[in-house]
Amino acid sequence: SDYLQLART
């Protein structure tokens, strides 16, 4: 669960 990675989508 990486919120940073999700925000980079």
Swiss-Prot record:
> What protein name is recorded for this chain?
Extended FMRFamide-2
Assigned GO CC terms:
extracellular region
Q: What does this protein do?
A: FMRFamides and FMRFamide-like peptides are neuropeptides.
Q: Which family does it belong to?
A: Belongs to the FARP (FMRF amide related peptide) family.
- List GO BP terms, alphabetically: neuropeptide signaling pathway
Q: Provide the alphabetized UniProt keywords.
A: Neuropeptide, Secreted
Q: Which organism is it from?
A: Pachyphasma brandbergense (Gladiator)
State the source organism's domain of life.
Eukaryota
Please state where this protein is localized: Secreted
| Primary residence | secreted
